[in-house]
Every structure is written in structure tokens, then in C-alpha cells.
A protein has these predicted regions:
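Membrane-interface helix termini and inter-helical loops of multi-pass transporters
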Residues: 15-19, 64-76, 123-141, 184-193
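C-terminal-most transmembrane helix of multi-pass membrane proteins
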Residues: 137-139, 172-229
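Hydrophobic transmembrane alpha-helices of multi-pass small-molecule transport proteins
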Residues: 48-68, 84-88, 118-119, 173, ...
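Hydrophobic/small/kink-forming positions within alpha-helical transmembrane segments
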Residues: 3, 7, 11, 34-38, ...
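Specific transmembrane alpha-helical segments of multi-pass solute transporters/efflux pumps
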Residues: 1-29, 65, 145-163
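Structural signature of hydrophobic alpha-helical transmembrane segments
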Residues: 14-32, 74-87, 135-146, 202
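Transmembrane alpha-helical segments that form core, pore/gating elements
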Residues: 36-38, 42, 73-127, 141, ...
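C-terminal transmembrane-helix exit sites in multi-pass transporters
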Residues: 32-54, 177-197
Length: 229
């Protein structure tokens, strides 16, 4: 089940990227961080905190600024990307649930194996297999499989094992920021003031949901303690 959810998330995000920009794809995918507490509420009866509700409102506002046009409609790419975000949220909750009982390395291997089988099955069913791959395709496949997927998740798991939760959440939330940065540099995406405001709202929503801005309160407490009497 966990592998199938990962397959659905990857597929929706990838197909969404065909009809939207990389920057919008990165930020709309990041909404899974905000959705996780509500998926936990629906499936595991763990009520969201007031910070989660605030993050949800901010995130909805950000999605509206990023995705909705003047007719309040959403294009296919943005809709598929949001669906991918929902699947990532379901996947994260499932991993948290089963990861408590299973070896994380084995669980990761099973996820990738199941996801790969689903991808192969769907490609055989709906795609025409080429006799030869285009020049440069092997390099792209190796980059996506090794660096963008396996190595990225491995470094994330290792980093989270030695980093406190709040700083780790902030660092992970920067994924969407780097997505926009590389989209501007490599893809030539134009970030309008409306898009920038939407990106900022989604980013703040992710940080609020993941950290409750606890790092700000700790910083203020340290300053107060260091102040002369």
C-alpha cells in the first residue's frame, strides 16, 4: 500500500509538471506538509492543533494566488500537482504508521520496489515501448533514479536522525524555495508579485504547520535570559 501511494504521488506530480511551471509544481506539492495533520485526524483521530488550522487557511490563500485565474478555475497541471500533494500526505502518514513496526531500510526498499512495479505495469499498459532510447535518456534516468530519488531520500533520512525536528522541518520546507530558484535560473520562469505572495503564504504555512514557529519563541527566551537584570 505504501509503495502504491508513492507511485500515485510521483505520477500525479510528474504529469502535473507537463502543464504547469516547475516553481508552481514545487510549491503546490509542498502542501502535503500542511495536509498531514488533517489526514492523521481523519484516519488516526489525532486532532490538529490551532497552528495546523492557521497553516491550512494560509495554505488555501497561497494556493488561490498561485493556481486560480480570473475565472476562479484551475488548470490541469496545478490540479494534478495538488493531487500529488494529497498522495504524498497519505504516503507520509502510512510510512509513520508502518515505520513504527518495520525496519525503515526494508520499508524503503519495499516502497521503491512496489512503486517500480506499478510504473512498469502502467507503462506497458498505456505506453508504446521504444525500440531504442533517445540520446541522453540514460543520463536523465540515472539522475532521476539515483540523485533525485534514492540519494535525496537517503540523505533526508540520515539527516533527520541527527537533527532536531524543528530545524529539520525548516530545512525540508526549503525544497519548494529551491524549486522556484532553479526554475527561474534554468527554466526562465517569471515570478509575478501575485505568484510571489502565493509562494510566501504556502512557505509560511508549511513552517507554521511543521514547527509552530517554536524557533522564534526559543530565540526570544534566550534573549530574555541573556538580558542584564
Amino acid at each position: 500500500m505504501v509503495g502504491v501511494l508513492l507511485f500515485l504521488a510521483y505520477t500525479a506530480q510528474t504529469y502535473g509538471l507537463k502543464d504547469t511551471t516547475p516553481g508552481k509544481n514545487a510549491f503546490l506539492t509542498a502542501v502535503y506538509c500542511v495536509l498531514v495533520p488533517f489526514v492523521n485526524w481523519a484516519l488516526l483521530r489525532r486532532r490538529p492543533s490551532r497552528w495546523n488550522w492557521l497553516a491550512a487557511v494560509m495554505c488555501l490563500g497561497g494556493i488561490g494566488l498561485v493556481s486560480l485565474d480570473g475565472s476562479l478555475s484551475m488548470n490541469r497541471g496545478d490540479a494534478l500537482t495538488l493531487l500529488g500533494g494529497v498522495c504524498y500526505a497519505l504516503h507520509l502518514v502510512a510510512v509513520s504508521r508502518f515505520g513504527e513496526e518495520d525496519d525503515p531500510v526494508l520499508l524503503t526498499a519495499v516502497q521503491f520496489g512496489a512503486s517500480a512495479l506499478c510504473c512498469w505495469g502502467c507503462s506497458l499498459a498505456i505506453e508504446t515501448m521504444p525500440a531504442t532510447l533517445p540520446q541522453g535518456a540514460w543520463g536523465e534516468l540515472i539522475y532521476l533514479a539515483v540523485f533525485a530519488t534514492t540519494l535525496a531520500l537517503l540523505m533526508q533520512n540520515v539527516g533527520q536522525s541527527v537533527t532536531p525536528a524543528a530545524p529539520a522541518a525548516i530545512l525540508l520546507s526549503l525544497e519548494s524555495v529551491f524549486g522556484v530558484l532553479f526554475s527561474v535560473v534554468c527554466y526562465g520562469e517569471t515570478v509575478t508579485p501575485r505568484l510571489a505572495m502565493g509562494f510566501l503564504l504556502i512557505f509560511l504555512a508549511v513552517v507554521a504547520s511543521e514547527t509552530h514557529f517554536s524557533f522564534l519563541r526559543r530565540g526570544k527566551s534566550s534573549v530574555d535570559k541573556g538580558a542584564p537584570a
